[in-house]
Every structure is written in C-alpha cells, then in structure tokens.
Amino acid sequence: MADSTKFVQTITDGYTSKGDYIVLGAALLNGVPQKEALVKLPLKTLNRHGLIAGATGTGKTITLQVIAENMCAKGIPVLLMDLKGDLSGIAKAGITNPKIEERHAALGIPFVSNGSSVEFLTLSKENGAKLRATVSEFGPVLFSKVLNLNDT
C-alpha cells in the first residue's frame, strides 16, 4: 500500500502543471491502472515537437487520435498527415464495447464518444480540398506515393 501511495504521489507531482491539459490515461503499477495517477499533457507544451513510438499494436494511432480529439474539443486546430488513412475515423463518434467500458472504468475516466470536426485535404486528384505544397517540401516517401511509383 505504501508503494502504491508513493507511486501515485510521484506521478501526480510529475504531471502537475499550470493551465489546461489533456488527460491521456492513468499510470500503471504492476499492471493495474492507478485512477489517482492521471497522465496529463499540458496544452502549453503542444507547440513543441513530439514522438509517439512503439511496436505494431501498441496504441500509437489511438494515442494520436486521443490527442487530436481532445485538442479539437478544446478548440485547438489540428493538422494531421494521414498517409495510411488510419485517422479519418475521428470524424464519426465511436461505438462502445465491453472492452472500452472495462478500460474506462479501470481508469476512472468516463467514456464519451463524439465525432470531431474534420476537413479532408489532398495533395493528389483524390477527394478532398487541395492542399498546396511544393515538390521540395515532400520527402522521398511522400513524393513516391504522389507519383504512384513502385520499387522497380
């Protein structure tokens, strides 16, 4: 119990900041979410560079969706480059299921499903509003996708 109290206090102290924030989740202690140890992302830090890294299936896309949805809910404009089409689902409200309900109950965070305001932009002739860019701004991967190049 003392370990739990010390852990929660350490996380709480580390994620305390002035101003508004986004809740990303709760810290885990021995695989158990600690409802009192919320992981908070201060809005004032969102003008810096960031990295979301991990192996396949570890929640990188979901983390980015949560950040983008919460920023939209707070009135902050978001521009996401979605080459794989994984993020467009934030336009519609999600559907709950027992796994989501169980996770939110364990975190002590209510599940609220809302669609976000989305405008689709495009660099190609696909559907969406044309996004202007110069060729020099493209990296090699994006440039090859725009030109529909293959490995040969």
What are these regions (language model features)?
Residues 54-61, 133, 148:
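Short, charged/polar micro-motifs that form catalytic or ligand-binding hotspots
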Residues 1-55, 62-74, 78-79, 84-109, ...:
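Basic- and hydrophobic-enriched, low-structure N-terminal and domain-boundary segments
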